[in-house]
Amino acid sequence: MNYQDYIWDLGGTLLDNYGTSTAAFVHTLQDFGLTASHDEVYKALKVSTEYAVRQFAPRNKEFLKAYKANEAKELEHPILFDGASELLAQIIQQGGRNFLISHRDDQVLEILQKTQIGLYFTEVVTATNGFKRKPDPESMLYLKDKYQIQSGLVIGDRSIDVEAGQAAGFSCYLFDNMKNLEEFVDIELEKE
């Protein structure tokens, strides 16, 4: 194992949520009498939710609230990327620690419970903690100081994850798929 501590992003890294988030966004656009293609919305959401709202519904003050409500319905049945749970478990079995930082509120805790991966995290940081949003490194520096992290890897699917991790002095991995990540962190998953 190349690192002792792993700081994870949730959406798009452990949780395969961009499809459901995109569907909720397109549905919300339709509710507001607006249209955009699935692919356009998907690309915009990969930048950020705020960016997507500015692109497709900039003059609708209630849009974000309606989208978040639709997205919450979609996320009632969260789906992990294949191998995510096993990788988290193996890190723990090999003496490592997992941490999670998300921009979402305490809905994250429900998602972790539904996907049964909450037990793999030493600490989960959500919007409720009140830290500045990534790419600001404040939440990562909090974990670094509290847990005295020396050998840490930040894993996320967006440039803001990498920027925050680098600013906090961590190594970073821009997530593309679970198999490549397993090879990068040099963990042998136990096969049943």
Region locations from a protein language model:
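N-terminal helical cap/lid subdomain that shapes the substrate entry/recognition surface
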Residues: 2-82, 86, 94
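Conserved phosphate-coupling serine/threonine residues in phosphotransfer and NTP-handling enzymes
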Residues: 13, 101-102
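Conserved short hydrophobic patches within well-ordered secondary structure
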Residues: 18, 22, 101, 111-112, ...
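Residue-level signal for short amphipathic helical patches enriched in basic/charged
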Residues: 44, 48, 103, 150
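Short, flexible loop segments at the rims of nucleotide/cofactor-binding pockets, characterized by
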Residues: 74-79, 102-103, 130-132
